[in-house]
Curated annotation (Swiss-Prot):
<keyword id="KW-0378">Hydrolase</keyword>
<comment type="similarity">
    <text>Belongs to the urease beta subunit family.</text>
</comment>
<comment type="pathway">
    <text>Nitrogen metabolism; urea degradation; CO(2) and NH(3) from urea (urease route): step 1/1.</text>
</comment>
<comment type="subunit">
    <text>Heterotrimer of UreA (gamma), UreB (beta) and UreC (alpha) subunits. Three heterotrimers associate to form the active enzyme.</text>
</comment>
<dbReference type="InterPro" id="IPR050069">
    <property type="entry name" value="Urease_subunit"/>
</dbReference>
<dbReference type="Pfam" id="PF00699">
    <property type="entry name" value="Urease_beta"/>
</dbReference>
<dbReference type="GO" id="GO:0035550">
    <property type="term" value="C:urease complex"/>
</dbReference>
<dbReference type="InterPro" id="IPR036461">
    <property type="entry name" value="Urease_betasu_sf"/>
</dbReference>
<keyword id="KW-0963">Cytoplasm</keyword>
<dbReference type="InterPro" id="IPR002019">
    <property type="entry name" value="Urease_beta-like"/>
</dbReference>
<dbReference type="GO" id="GO:0009039">
    <property type="term" value="F:urease activity"/>
</dbReference>
<protein>
    <recommendedName>
        <fullName>Urease subunit beta</fullName>
        <ecNumber>3.5.1.5</ecNumber>
    </recommendedName>
</protein>
<dbReference type="GO" id="GO:0043419">
    <property type="term" value="P:urea catabolic process"/>
</dbReference>
Amino acid sequence: MIPGELLIGPGEHPLNTGRRTKTLLVRNTGDRPIQVGSHYHFAETNQALDFDRAAARGMRLNIASGTAVRFEPGQERTVELLDYAGARLVFGFQGRVQGAP
């Protein structure tokens, strides 16, 4: 085994089952590409991304860990968000939430 290697059995392995999801339309109003990582608190992303930020509180992108979504200038796309697990207390990022529900 190689350090960090994962040995996964055959078959499908669904991720994030049973967790609440939400779909939002997002548009990059800026003049530069914006990339958002898998676990970034979506409500606190770059202000050039135009979407319903209140609806995104306590949520992250529903994509595989370690991956990201890139928004090109002027691009509009639909994303699926997923509730954070556990106590759902969010700290850091841009400091807008700091644990508030």
